[in-house]
Amino acid sequence: LTSSNCLANEIYVNQIGDSITTTINQDGENNQIEGLSGSGNAQLSGNNKTVTFNQTGDNNQTRVWTNGGNQQMSLTQDGNSNLSKMDNHGDNNNMSVDIDGDSNFTHTEIGNGGDNDNNMSITIDGDNNAIYSEVISGDSNNVDIQIHKQDNSYAYVRVNGNSNNVKAWQGKHEDGNIDTDETGDNEVYWIVTGDSNNLASYQTDDNGNGGQHIANYITGDSNTVKHTQRGSGDHDGFIAIDGDSNDVELSQRGNSSNEQFADIEIDGDGHTVDVYQRYADHTANINLTNAGGAYTLDLEQTSYSAKTYSMTGTCTNSSGCGITVTQN
């Protein structure tokens, strides 16, 4: 199904069946592929489907609900002020969203019935974009969010499940390259419930025009959390964890003209926490509450500027807890 060179067209889809290939192309403005509370259908059910949505222009909308296994789903929007929503239910699905433009809103979701082994990839290029990505309930899912060439962007990630791998990038590509035209004022928020998840947040601003903010809220055990901020702007990092045996690494790197602030609060046993702050003015507040197993803290602050930290901990382990602080 293809429509091209058009304005204000609406497409309603209600598809049921297996092994189906569907492609929808829209070129113009104010076009809609309806569904998910925008009214209309845009529902696809069945296994082994390949579904592709392409929209070029401004003020377009794609809203789709899918159900099935082994699906290949792709959504691309090129333009400004577009909206996209993709809600997936099922196992072993691949979801890909690629947005190029400014002031766009995208929401991707892995279903609410214990959906497992899905791959979700979201790539955004542009300014003033908002991204919501959710694993409502499921295990062993992979989520990768990359936001390039931007300022004033917002990413919200929610995960409920175990053994998920989640990465969010702002200003840094997965291959390690850094955007030279990325100006900061970006935010990432995580809310994670579950065990044995691997979670990584990366932010880079290269021109020093704005700051970066990351906040991680985690409930569960044996999670690995990596939080990295670098560049010329101010950095704020916040991590709150309720659970046992979590591994936390927070790294901030700037220059002599900006500020870095880290706040880590962990309630549970047997955590390993590494905090690294380099250059700029540093402040680190760390609160570790412990009811049994020992925790380990390694804090390093390197700078010619101000360096301050506060440490609050409760350690009931008979062998003690390990704390190392280096300032130079």
Task: Pin down the residues of each PLM region.
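Low-complexity repeat regions of mature extracellularly deployed or surface/particle-associated proteins
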Residues: A8-N328
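Gram-negative bacterial Sec-dependent N-terminal signal peptides
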Residues: L1-A8
